[in-house]
């Protein structure tokens, strides 16, 4: 125990630890920068994945044009420009609940969860077909 913890304990002040701190991470008023052209929504953190870099390349985008959010964060997003969304989830209810938060949607791509998508050639082909549609 450090000095601060001991002092709080002596004063009778309870310390609380968040059970799921990632839920609160950046949860209030996420404003989307002007350079963002794609928002990925996934329960996993995919921002540093080489596969995401390949998807961005197929969309003629760079890493700085992509914003990766989770399903808890998207409801707090503020977007003013037309944008593409890529929703990664096998849960169709979760996707249906998320669609109203896809503001200024130019296109919405859907894929299974990131874990499934990485190893599923059919899912990759389906994403490619979605990208090719006007």
Curated annotation (Swiss-Prot):
The keyword Nucleotidyltransferase applies. It catalyses: DNA(n) + a 2'-deoxyribonucleoside 5'-triphosphate = DNA(n+1) + diphosphate. The keyword Nucleotidyltransferase applies. Transmembrane segments: none annotated. Keywords: DNA replication, DNA-directed DNA polymerase, Nucleotidyltransferase, Transferase. Pfam families: DNA_III_psi. Its EC number is 2.7.7.7. GO terms for biological process: DNA replication. It comes from the Bacteria. One of its GO terms (molecular function) is 3'-5' exonuclease activity. InterPro entries: DNA_pol_III_psi, DNA_pol_III_psi_sf, DNA_pol_III_psi_subgr. Belongs to the DNA polymerase III psi/HolD chain family. DNA polymerase III contains a core (composed of alpha, epsilon and theta chains) that associates with a tau subunit. This core dimerizes to form the POLIII' complex. PolIII' associates with the gamma complex (composed of gamma, delta, delta', psi and chi chains) and with the beta chain to form the complete DNA polymerase III complex. Interacts directly with the chi subunit (holC). Part of the beta sliding clamp loading complex, which hydrolyzes ATP to load the beta clamp onto primed DNA to form the DNA replication pre-initiation complex. DNA polymerase III is a complex, multichain enzyme responsible for most of the replicative synthesis in bacteria. This DNA polymerase also exhibits 3' to 5' exonuclease activity. This is DNA polymerase III subunit psi.
